[in-house]
Structure formats: structure tokens, C-alpha cells
Amino acid sequence: MEFVKQADTEVFEAMQAEKNRQQDKIELIASENFVTKAVMDAMGSILTNKYAEGYPGKRYYGGCEHVDVVENLARDRAKELFGADHANVQPHSGAQANMAVYSAVLEPGDTVLGMNLNHGGHLTHGSPVNFSGQLYNFVDYGVDKETEQLDYDAVLEKAKEVKPKLIVAGASAYSRSINFAKFREIADAVDAYLMVDMAHIAGLVATGEHENPVPHADFVTTTTHKTLRGPRGGMILCKEEFAKKVDKAIFPGIQGGPLMHVIAAKAVSFKEALSDDFKAYSKQIVANAKLLGEALNKEGIRIVSGGTDNHLLLLDVTPLQLTGKVAEKALDDIGITTNKNTIPFDQESPFVTSGIRIGTAAVTTRGFGEEEMKEIASIISLTLKHHEDEAKLKEAAQRVQALTEKFTLYA
């Protein structure tokens, strides 16, 4: 950051402060992770200088022979990771990947079946405040009130009732495995396309820790950060028959020039994800999440659906007489970063919520293991149960500091 320091002290100081925040706090936001230095180097490379509208071998600018190599590496590695026919690595985000699939196969007003945001879905799965809910007729499905898990029979009944052109599977706050084969059966029963948004679980899918949606779905979208531990960006995988439609939907449909420095970082992260080290890392993410959930349960913290099958846990804080907003602030004050989150059948607004969402991808990258999960659960319990007790909060903050000093970030 030395060049930034010389050129712009204000930006440098903000970057330095953020570096300190990441070092000094425990990152439990489920959608965040820490990239490797190699990925970071690619992101900050000279490839940011190159415009490359189009696709490898078919660009609208000259001088693209080297960025073509980079994009082909990213595409080939993505296909190898997930066993896909086709990969488009140009989407700037997961939201744009979803938008591209919608525009490739839908007309405005078409009916789509997606997961309710309050039950664990995503804004781009039909929220009325999002383009998806404004352009298309989204109808939602949710979880069973008793089990707080997906009820596939209910999803099938809803699909038969509304006859969607597209079914969207995948979630942003659902801690259980998703049966993609069952979603394929449901889609086939109503002659619908199936799109899976695996943004949260892509890293787990790549290593076999979660069922792979690629053999079942017509389209699979994802972000490249989160459990995949790449740069912030998006990607679309699809069957060969949809490749041209998908590519056209991205460019020239909704994007212009691709971010070649980000695509380079994607390529690097995909190579990392193909390694045995990443497989071990991914396995540890799930082990840590399960252990953290068990430890929190022993502390008397209610876990939505009773546990987790992936990297994510959704905590219901209402039995503690708290809101998600208050819980998030209390934890942040002692050095644990989370986010307030709605839970199924939540009575609070999205700005208040009844829960918090946590995940283990970032802390696992940092080196935290089973003993640290038990300690984190104990600290969370102490903080939430005594959120107005200064002595208890001071103790919690000191215990957080002991953990962050033990596991240095970007040493």
C-alpha cells in the first residue's frame, strides 16, 4: 500500500484502518472470506488497464491475446472444478449472473418460483425491491414451520399451482443441504427451467462437501468469493445448449468490458480450489460450523432448523429477549463481526430482525479449529446473555483479542 500512502493519505488511512479491523476482529459474516496474497496480487495487477469487450478469440479491441489466455484459464478451471459444459466468468457479481440467466430465458412478466427472502432466499430471487421482483412475476416457496427446512412436496405443489417458466433454487441464509436432484424432478414435472444459485456453497460444492447442482440444473450461478475464496465477482455455469444465450445475455446484454484483473484473480482462485489443501480447508469449514452450532446449542442459543450441513448458522436471539440488530451491535462492540438477519416467519422488520447469521469460512481460512469454535461459542453466549454488563463485555473483548493475536492475518 506504499504507493497509495504517497498518493492519497486519506484513502491509505481508511485502508490501513480496515486492515487493522480485519486483524483485530473475528469475522463471522457468512458471505465473507480472506483471499490469498496471490489472488490479491492478481486483482491489483496491470490487467486492470486492458479493455476486452467480447470473448476470447472474438474481441472488439486489439491487443487481447494475453488476456484471452487468462480468461480461457479461468473458464477451463471453472469447468473442471464443477464438471460443467460451459462457464462464463465475466459477471461482475452474483446479482448480475442471476440477471443474465433471467434475461436469457424469460420475458418480462413471466412466472418464476423462488425461495422467500425471509426464509433464506436472496434479493435477486424475487424480492419486490429488486429488479427480479419488478420485472418478473416471482412466486415464493419457503421452509416448513416446524422443521424450518425445505418441504419439497410443498414446493412441488406450489410449482403445479403456478406453473413457472423457471424455478430458482439456492439461498443466502439456509443452513441445510439442498436436494438439487429433487428440484430437477419438480422442474421436470411442470416443464420449467431450473437455475441454482450456489453463491454461498460453491467452495463446498467444488470439493464434494455439498451435492453438485451442475448435473441437475440448466443454469448454475455463483459468486466467486464466500466459500470459494476468490475475488468479489460472479460466474455462470450451464449446459452447452444454453452457452450462446448466456454469453449474449452478459455481453452485450447487461455488461460491457469485463474486468480482466478480476478474471485473472478468479483463475488463480480456481487453481487454488483444485488443490488438496483447499479440499482439506473446505472440509474444515463444515466441521467448524457443525461444532460451533453444537457448542452454541449447549450454551442455550437456538439454532434455526437445529443445526447446519454447510458453513452457515442462523441464530434466533428472541429467546434472549434481543433483536438481531441489538445482537449484531453487542457482538461487534466486543470484536465479533456478524450480520442481523431475518429468520423464517420473522415478525420483525429486515432492519431489526430476530436473528443473526454467522459462518465459518473466514475464521477457517485464518486457521481457527475445533477448540476455537468452542471458545467463540462461549464468547457469543457470554456477550448476548450479558449485553449490558460492562465487566462481562470487557472479559469477552479480552478473549477475542487473545484469539486474534494468536492467529495473525496476512503476516
Swiss-Prot record:
A GO cellular-component term linked to this record: cytosol
Catalyzed chemical reaction(s): (6R)-5,10-methylene-5,6,7,8-tetrahydrofolate + glycine + H2O = (6S)-5,6,7,8-tetrahydrofolate + L-serine
One of the protein's GO biological processes: tetrahydrofolate interconversion
Record carries keyword Phosphoprotein: no
UniProt site (Plays an important role in substrate specificity): H225
Gene Ontology terms, MF aspect: glycine hydroxymethyltransferase activity; pyridoxal phosphate binding
Primary localization class, coarse: cytoplasm
Location of the protein in the cell: Cytoplasm
Alphabetically ordered keywords of this record: Amino-acid biosynthesis, Cytoplasm, One-carbon metabolism, Pyridoxal phosphate, Transferase
Subunit structure, interactors included: Homodimer.
Annotated function: Catalyzes the reversible interconversion of serine and glycine with tetrahydrofolate (THF) serving as the one-carbon carrier. This reaction serves as the major source of one-carbon groups required for the biosynthesis of purines, thymidylate, methionine, and other important biomolecules. Also exhibits THF-independent aldolase activity toward beta-hydroxyamino acids, producing glycine and aldehydes, via a retro-aldol mechanism.
Identification of the protein by name: Serine hydroxymethyltransferase
Species per Swiss-Prot/TrEMBL record: Oceanobacillus iheyensis (strain DSM 14371 / CIP 107618 / JCM 11309 / KCTC 3954 / HTE831)
Gene that encodes the chain: glyA
